[in-house]
Structure formats: structure tokens, C-alpha cells
Regions:
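SF2 helicase/translocase NTPase motor core
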Residues: 57-61, 66, 85-94, 144-158, ...
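Catalytic glutamate of the conserved HExxH
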Residues: 192
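Short, flexible coil/linker elements and helix-boundary hinge sites characteristic
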Residues: 26, 55, 76, 92, ...
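Accessory N-terminal region flanking or inserted into the helicase ATPase core
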Residues: 2-5, 16, 32, 103-189
Length: 192
């Protein structure tokens, strides 16, 4: 059964979902319940509320987290193996194309933040499982971007990641899905 709870912030969506978690906890091992949120802050808030409400420990609820956190932990990824701002800056200097990139947000949600349409196009293409050229041809970007520069940057990012054994947040999710390493759940809650 699929239930969708909609509403703006502060309207009780998380409380409603935790009430549903309560129903499942009566007959379901907490290790078989996944509760995923977009931000680490929201995932921890839900976990902490569940710990208090259901008299559990944090360890009892290992799958109250973000999807990126689940992938990171399950695959045994180290932070130094994930593309950071310094890597984009280094690559930009090497190819003489400014790669304006901001760190992933402080909530560790995997939100990619940049003012660069080149990087945005590449990221959207990866998320949609299409080529950067196809994403470019959709004309969803706002700045003047040359297809030539886009393809150079896309190829150079992949080469850089390979050379330095790095992945980005999208790679993390892709590798997780392909690994078939996901825990088996009886029920999953998505608090987005």
C-alpha cells in the first residue's frame, strides 16, 4: 500500500509518518524499516523523535537517514574519495575553464550547488541517465554554454575521477543501486 502525505513545512507530515512507523513497529523488526529524508538534519530529527516516542536507541533505528548516507555507509565509501570543491577547482585550473562549484550543502543531502550551467547540465544528464549532449539539446540552461566546452568538461571530470579514484554524489547512488547491497525492508518511509 502506498500512502502519500502532502503539506508545507510545519503541518505534521513527519508526525503522521512516525504514527505510521508506530503501527509497523508492533509487528516489524526496526532493522526492516527504512525511513529516509532529504537532509541529514530531517533524518536525525525523525530518528530522535522515534527514539523518544518508541523508547528505542539510535542503534535500534539504523535506517533513519538520507539515501546518500545509506549508500556511503553500505558501500564503505570514505569522504576523501568523494569529489569536493578543491577537486573541481583543481580540474578547472588544469583545463582552463572556471568550474564554479559550492560544497554540497551542510545537511549532506547530496544537493549539487553551482552557478555553472556546464556543471548543472552534466549533473542533470547523470540524474536523467542521458548524455550531456542530449541534456544540452533540451535547452534548459540559462547561460551561453558551448557544446564543445560542455563535452570537454564532462570528459575531463570523468578522467579526473578515474585518475584520483573519486566519485561524486550521483555516482554514489548509482553504485549503490548497481551493487544490490540494499538492506531488505518490509516498509519504507520517504520524508522529502
Amino acid at each position: 500500500m502506498k500512502t502519500i502525505v502532502l503539506g508545507p513545512p510545519g503541518t505534521g507530515k513527519t508526525t503522521t509518518l512516525l504514527n505510521e512507523v508506530d503501527k509497523y513497529l508492533k509487528n516489524t523488526d526496526p532493522n526492516r524499516i527504512g525511513y529516509f529524508s532529504f537532509t541529514q538534519k530531517a533524518a536525525y530529527e525523525a530518528r530522535d523523535r522515534a527514539v523518544e516516542k518508541f523508547n528505542l536507541t539510535e542503534d535500534d533505528l539504523p535506517y533513519f537517514r538520507t539515501l546518500h548516507s545509506l549508500a556511503f555507509r553500505t558501500l564503505g565509501i570514505k569522504k576523501e574519495n568523494v569529489m569536493q570543491k578543491k577537486h573541481y577547482e583543481d580540474l578547472g585550473k588544469k583545463i582552463n575553464i572556471r568550474l564554479d562549484y559550492h560544497e554540497y550543502d551542510n545537511e549532506y543531502s547530496g544537493i549539487f550547488s553551482t552557478n555553472s550551467d556546464i556543471l548543472r547540465i552534466i549533473q542533470l544528464a547523470k540524474l536523467r541517465s542521458i548524455t550531456p549532449e542530449r541534456q544540452y539539446n533540451l535547452k534548459e540552461h540559462t547561460q551561453d554554454v558551448s557544446l564543445r566546452d560542455l563535452l570537454i568538461v564532462s570528459n575531463e571530470i570523468e578522467a579526473y575521477k578515474k585518475e584520483y579514484n573519486l566519485i561524486d554524489f550521483t555516482d554514489m547512488i548509482t553504485q549503490f543501486v548497481l551493487s544490490d547491497a540494499s538492506p531488505k525492508f518490509d516498509v519504507v518511509f520517504i520524508d522529502e
